[in-house]
Regions:
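Beta-rich, blade/repeat-based domains predominating
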Residues: 1-5, 19, 43-58, 88-105, ...
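Residue position within the beta-strands of beta-propeller blades
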Residues: 12-13, 61, 108, 159
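Short glycine/acidic-enriched loop and turn motifs that connect beta-strands
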Residues: 16-20, 65-68, 112-115, 164-166
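A short beta-strand motif characteristic of beta-propeller blades
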Residues: 36-41, 82-88, 132-139, 182-184
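A generic, well-ordered mixed alpha/beta core segment in the N-terminal half of proteins
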Residues: 39-76, 83-86
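Loop-centered beta-sheet repeat module
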Residues: 107-165
């Protein structure tokens, strides 16, 4: 689930279903925050995590089951259309997708046996996602980066770790690459 930051909308999706027909909904809220109505929509894949880009032009989702990243363009009312980008790296257990404050990159952490932290350039106008080189930021062995948060003023990204039950901090370089600073 995620909320639109400037419209009274919530986005929800199931975690499973037939490809391209995964049930989801846009929930319209009343002024007091209560449910007004909803509109059923279909997503390519079930998403364990949804987030919007900086300009609120696209909603991004990652699937824990098949590991795919999907980017959907939003119309003027905030309703997702068909995916404009789908990335399938052949990994499972993606856990989160959350763009940095400048909106220029996408980072997708994978846990368990698929240990990876994939990094991409992001074009907020088109929703296009392009791998950085190297694509994998190589999280510390046994860490399992799960969810992330950005420092409000510094180029730092923090990940909670599922396997290591800890915290890893990364410095975000000017080119978008993540470099491990601490693993505690």
């Amino acid at each position: 689930i995620t909320a639109h930051p400037s419209k009274p909308l919530l986005y929800i999706t199931a975690t499973g279903g037939d490809p391209g027909k995964v049930p989801g909904a846009v929930v319209f809220l009343k002024k007091d925050g209560s449910y007004q109505k909803h509109q059923n929509i279909n997503f390519n894949d079930g998403a364990c995590y949804l987030s919007l880009d900086k300009e609120n032009r696209h909603i991004l989702g990652v699937s824990y089951g098949n590991g795919r990243l999907n980017v959907y363009r939003l119309d003027e009312q905030g309703i997702p259309g068909k995916a404009v980008t789908t990335i399938d790296e052949g990994k499972r257990e993606a856990h989160c997708v959350l763009l940095p404050p400048d909106g220029k990159n996408v980072y997708v952490p994978y846990v368990k046996g698929n240990l990876a932290l994939l990094q991409y350039a992001y074009d907020g106008k088109t929703g296009k996602v392009t791998p950085l080189e190297p694509k994998d930021a190589k999280p510390p062995l046994g860490s399992g980066p799960r969810h992330m948060a950005y420092h409000p003023t510094l180029p730092m990204v923090y990940f909670s770790n599922e396997q290591g039950i800890g915290l890893s901090s990364y410095r975000r370089e000017a080119n978008g690459q993540l470099k491990v600073e601490q693993d505690i």
